């Protein structure tokens, strides 16, 4: 921990706008230990939010679900946190002046995170229309990070048959989300397997072009708006 704080400190020297949650926050015993700090109850969670504030964090990142199970199409690695718990987590962060970025997968979990007030959904794999409408109606920005799947096809680490199905499902969902009017934004999940920093966001852009059409001015404008909303939301007031 602390690397992102150092990165933010030196970023202006390179012309980079760098914002950080300092660390992600996850429920003890659930996914998130690789990037964050755990809590067992709401008091511990609130204390972690206050620590982020003390250390100058720009926003709060919470982990409400596991990750995709790449061995099978359509499943997430663990049961999501409950709605009431997520709602309280978002409320506490908002009360401290933070926006909330939620690592969330699965239709019900995405829908509930959006309704709970999460400002953005990172990943959002396996959403359904109800979840998409929830994101639209609650002005939640959706950052699909679909390049994580695309870049692994053909690498031999997982079944290409499964990866292709996940890619096709994700592509259809992005297309439908765009049609519905969900605010989409580019994000790469850089640091994931075969998603290097810098190149990852270029790969994500290429995925969106493949899904929504190359040289589509409306798509470009929509994604620029999404980037603007992310920059606007994720800075501590």
Language-model segments: which ranges?
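Active-site environment of divalent metal-dependent phosphoester hydrolases
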Residues: 1-5, 26-27, 66-70, 105-111, ...
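N-terminal active-site wall of soluble small-molecule enzyme domains
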Residues: 82-93, 101-114
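Divalent-metal coordination cores built from histidine and acidic residues
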Residues: 1-91, 143-145
